């Protein structure tokens, strides 16, 4: 068997990566008559980027369109430049870079905003990094990519199935496969055997620390205004669901509860914005249980390099204030940030962490849950849960991935109890349901180290979250140019 080229002098592929590169080359050279490509679905942290660059440098074609989330564009550009691959970047409605570029880098949202430029040619290869971004076939993002033509097509995603069979069908549709509606599960299972390559991170168990330790911080209200308001909000949500209100209305009520759980003032500010400042007067004067619990974690350890995941921007500000008060140097990754600002924050946090300065990175979970290498942060705190288990898995592996040398601890702040019909606990129940469907489709898609929390007293007493919430979800768009 002939040797494969490495991206640059001094680089060497790990054994599983060489297998992956050869599999990708074989798929492009022979295919199956329908698709010269496939889905590289290795666990997060196994090096899908470098395997893809291995394909690019060993199987040369004319022009490759590489689509990625904004947070990953600079990471791709650096890796490709280091490998001697000439790139062009789409910015300000045109391609910027060498005319003889081999790889054209663009974000998902810029594809659908500039469809004429993206579809005026048949690309020699199209690569979707974090390809699960097109899982919802109804979105502009998915519809636009379905119109982009390519002789070879690749999906890179550690979580190609997040909500169910429709996710996988959309990816197969993009690759060119037709899946029948009758017997769809069996058809998808059969295709997954050939079109999808998946290896678990346990392959690297001998060169990585032990799996992350998950610590669940279960918090209970002590009564008072916070307790009473929470119950009122949960009651409204349950009433709306029982009455079969429109999903958009239910989603809004659900988000209001999430805001209140994060910090009551976030909820009050949101309601005042909606009603022109007339809904509440004055700031919240009561307790903020979850923020108090976060402060307690920092009281116990105000030194460990820490990664905190949040949902709301104001929530991130409260977390930042608490961390700063404990002596942390704080950095952000959130929707709307430019690539240069994001890159600077990550590099500075790495530099300071190496110097022994306490650093804390706050990530908005849908903006910083995929692709980033943040191994220097060894304590992960989920300030709030997310209803999509794959988002949680992606987020956790920003820290626990190949190259991590230290033990990683993950904290989950779970507010409430069964008696309070806790929202966060119900999310974890929904996680179990979604994961079981994913494993049914393809057993190898099981992520090795996600937490399986028991939910005591859940039997029918908790809220049942609507299954169509994911249809409402939107990742942050690119910064406005």
Regions found by a protein language model. Name each.
Residues 44, 151-164:
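Conserved helicase ATPase motor motifs in RecA-like P-loop NTPase domains
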Residues 105-110, 116-120, 140-150, 155, ...:
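Inter-lobe coupling linker of SF2 helicases/translocases
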Residues 387-396, 400-478:
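A conserved SF2-helicase RecA2
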Residues 112-116, 163-165, 316-320, 360-378, ...:
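SF2 helicase motor core recognition
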Residues 72-93, 175-178:
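Conserved helix-turn-beta segment of the N-terminal RecA-like "Helicase ATP-binding" lobe
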Residues 62-82, 311-314:
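Conserved Walker A/P-loop ATP-binding site and its immediately adjacent core
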Residues 1-39:
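Conserved pre-motif I regulatory segment
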Residues 9, 36-37, 43, 51-60, ...:
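Conserved Helicase C-terminal RecA-like lobe
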